[in-house]
Amino acid sequence: MGEKMQFTELDQYLFGQGTHYDIYKKLGAHPTTQHRKKGVYFAVWAPNARYVSVIGDFNNWDNQANPMNRVGEIGVYEIFVPGAKVGDLYKFFIVGYHGEELYKADPYANEAELRPGTASRITDITDYKWKDTTWMKKRPEFDEKREPMAIYEVHPGSWKKHPAENEDDPGFYNYREFAHELAAYVKEMGYTHVELMGIAEHPFDGSWGYQVTGYYAPTSRYGTAQDFKYMVDYLHRNKIGVILDWVPAHFPKDAHGLANFDGTAVYEHEDRRQGEHPGGGTKIYNYGRPEVKNFLIANALYWIEECHVDGLRVDAVASMLYLDYGKKDGEWVANKYGDNKNLEAIEFFKHLNTVVLGRNHGTVMIAEESTAWPQVTGKAEDNGLGFSLKWNMGWMNDFLEYMKLDPYFRKGDHNKMTFSMTYAYSERYVLVISHDEVVHLKCSMLNKMPGYPDDKFKNLKAAYAFMIFHPGKKLLFMGQDFGQLREWSEERELDWYLLKEDNHKDLQNFVKTLFHMYKKYPALYAGDNDPEGFEWINADDADRSIFSLVRKSPTKRNNLLFVVNYTPVERPDYRVGVPKKKQYKLIMDEHGLLDKPKVFKAEAQECDHREFSFAYPLPAYGIAVFTY
């Protein structure tokens, strides 16, 4: 590469501090020109390596052709290779600390070879011309605390598939064609965001993308890095936000990956009790090492700033917070205070969220955290973790347990539907029905419901209606909005043919109506984090398994009264207490929106500990939405 050193002393200093937030512009492979020669600048961090070279299509994979130069004490190796070009495959050949020969994919690669290949591919991340200027200019104004979020969770490889040309053809859609079909569906259904699973490169389809080897590379299953950017771009131009699953909790042991990168524990802890999950499946990052923190934080920024992604859903946060997560005595090491809190991971989250959200207003960081860890969405300066939102796993578990019950036994578990309101304002929550709930013999949402087929559809409508009216953002996994019967499998597409059947099409239309109503009425989202925005009318009608509640708009206009009946018993003269002596317009029932609202006048008759009430016929599995 001549005398020109690209990884400067400032780069070394910032990387060593863990604060080189655009490190991905230096490490990795970057097409450039030096001494009037076109080529590629390569740089890799391998602090304990004895020898490093870059090998690839450009040098016939000769591990002696392009030895790299070590830069300073931090352990970065760099080289400029004339003639290397976009599209070439490459790896780093490393002679490790103990003399072993290692062939590693580039941790900072922006594109990868299609599996089962494990090489990295040279690409130019500056080469895409974005057209989402309107979205990106408005993005800083987005405030998840006061705006609707209806998230459609999608696994791109199994949403839809092309007919296979042969037994080895998985039938994947390219990112570009996927974008067009997905945008049309999401807009029609009323979702505001998509949350995409399995985007970062991973070797094994069956991991669903949760065992990542290419953190900076959109998986090549669906196309190139440019194709991925087009997908984000197109979704933005259709006013759809994009959230990615992000997996900083662990990484796999694959030989080409991060594990034992230079013959030593570079990215993971050296002590297996700290650096490995039980059973030997995956490695745990060393969150206390500045260069490792830098790798992860810069990766979050890469997706958000370079790829225009609007947020990250951070996987398995609980496994990072607890040193003994999933471990037995003797399998973990206590912190300096003698307890099980992972102090380095806690500081990592505070640092991550402060930097990402501080630099990118209008984006969201969402924690999948399954315990009662306090202040997950609290401010980092107040000793919180600094996330924007947290998945509400407690609500989900109680809600699903209740809905699975035979209606005649629901009265015994009535509190499962009300308990969540005792902690609803302790965090900023997303109500989730995710992929995890429709796999591993847990049944699809429709088949969780009790009764005959007609009963299942009625129960599921009532379930989704309650979800919309409960405080919190919403997330629904693909297929559950039209009543997918089979459990989800990454190997096949959704059973779209079911939409030819009336029950499934009717359910889909009902869910569509719910989400469009959710976006239309600020009462359903603007007060999610304000106790004044919600009021139970009757949370105690266990004998009849009926719930009634009010969602209030900050403007005091277009408040909503919601009543739902979770039994097949009709209540022809059901009386509900109301907050005020006003007219209440029935705008939606279990069939959908009414063509013409029905008006009910409150009268001076005490009910539900309120001075005023009115009566109306509540059908079996009935749903009623009134405005006032």
Short names for language-model regions:
Residues 46-48, 72, 83, 155-160, ...:
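Short, flexible loop/turn elements at secondary-structure junctions
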Residues 101-102, 160-162, 202-205, 250-253, ...:
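Short catalytic/ligand-binding loop motif for oxyanion handling, primarily in non-cytosolic enzymes
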Residues 217-221, 336-343, 452-454, 498-505:
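A short acidic, glycine-rich active-site loop
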Residues 308-310, 328-490, 519-529, 533-576, ...:
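Conserved alpha/beta catalytic core and glycan-binding cleft of carbohydrate-active enzymes
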